[in-house]
Regions:
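N-terminal topogenic module of multi-pass integral membrane proteins
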Residues: 2-80, 84, 239-257
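Membrane-helix exit/interface motif
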Residues: 52, 79-83, 105-119, 136-143
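Structural signature of hydrophobic alpha-helical transmembrane segments
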Residues: 59-72, 120-132, 154-155, 182-185
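Juxtamembrane/interface segments of multi-pass membrane proteins
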Residues: 60, 112-125, 170-179, 205-210
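Hydrophobic/aromatic-rich structural module bridging two neighboring secondary-structure elements via a short loop
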Residues: 78-103
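Membrane-helix interface "capping/anchor" motifs
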Residues: 83-91, 142-153
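Alpha-helical membrane segments in multi-pass integral membrane proteins
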Residues: 128-139, 149-197
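Short, highly charged, low-complexity non-transmembrane loops/tails of multi-pass membrane proteins
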Residues: 204-228
Length: 259
């Protein structure tokens, strides 16, 4: 069998037992990492909303926040979630798609009553809304324990943010809402940092901005010479290969052979 060298997009000629078969080489199309886009959409919109909650900017900025919620916080995260689906990343796909739709739903809760399509949501309804999103975020946070520390910070501070928003709605305390706003700024800033870190580290090919990667410790597996079985219950049908050709073991398997 002979092979001809080829470049991307070329055909590969394979001579097999006197026959020549043309094999089309498909160009692999890779997807860029969508996480920074989703994290920036989430982080920047969260910071702007919570600057308002903290009382740093007044209610005249609400239009800007709604626009960010529709496009960058909402649409950008949904796009990132779809890209994560294509990459087979269930965590990223679920997180980005869900929080993108969260921003759209929040904009809907604010705009639909003003447009006459629904009644304003009461404090109990908003508290239940934030409770469910907090519960979802806590479940997602559990999964981040297998990921990096920076991502854990994003989800933990977001979990705290949702429950502080819930309590703020139930209590009606303006001081607590302002405190919640500052916590939300921290949450959004942590997402922005992680996004910039992922971009920078990928461009430079090394960890320039630390994100606290968790390294899994692999268990050491002892090696066994040919003809010997690893410790454990005997395997039915297994017989160690006898030495051949002047004492050399048969090279078929590092643990011997099946007969």
């Amino acid at each position: 069998m002979g092979f001809k060298s080829f470049q991307d997009g070329d055909s590969l000629s394979v001579a097999t037992y006197g026959r020549t078969v043309a094999v089309e080489k498909k160009e692999e199309t890779g997807l860029a990492n969508p996480a920074p886009l989703g994290l920036l959409g989430f982080g920047m919109t969260t910071v702007l909303l919570n600057i308002h909650n903290a009382g740093i900017i007044d209610a005249t900025s609400l239009g800007m926040i709604l626009a960010m919620g529709i496009f960058y916080g909402g649409l950008a995260q949904v796009i990132a979630g779809i890209m994560e689906f294509k990459k087979g990343n269930v965590f990223g796909a679920t997180a980005f798609s869900s929080y993108g739709l969260f921003w759209w739903s929040l904009v809907g809760l604010l705009l639909l009553p003003k447009m006459g399509y629904a009644d304003p949501v009461g404090k109990g309804g908003m508290a239940a809304y934030f409770f469910m999103w907090g519960l979802f975020t806590f479940c997602m946070y559990i999964s981040t324990l297998k990921k990096n520390r920076a991502l854990q910070t994003v989800f933990f501070t977001l979990f705290i943010l949702f429950f502080m928003l819930m309590i703020s709605e139930l209590s009606g305390s303006e001081a607590l809402l302002h405190l919640t706003g500052y916590e939300g700024i921290l949450c959004g800033a942590s997402a922005i940092y992680l996004a910039i870190a992922e971009i920078t580290n990928e461009i430079y090919g090394q960890e320039v901005l630390p994100i606290g990667e968790i390294k899994e410790v692999e268990e050491a597996r002892p090696e066994y010479p040919p003809g010997r079985m690893p410790p454990g219950p005997p395997v039915r049908g297994y017989r160690p290969t006898a030495p051949r050709f002047g004492g050399e073991e048969h090279p078929s398997s590092p643990y011997g052979g099946w007969r």
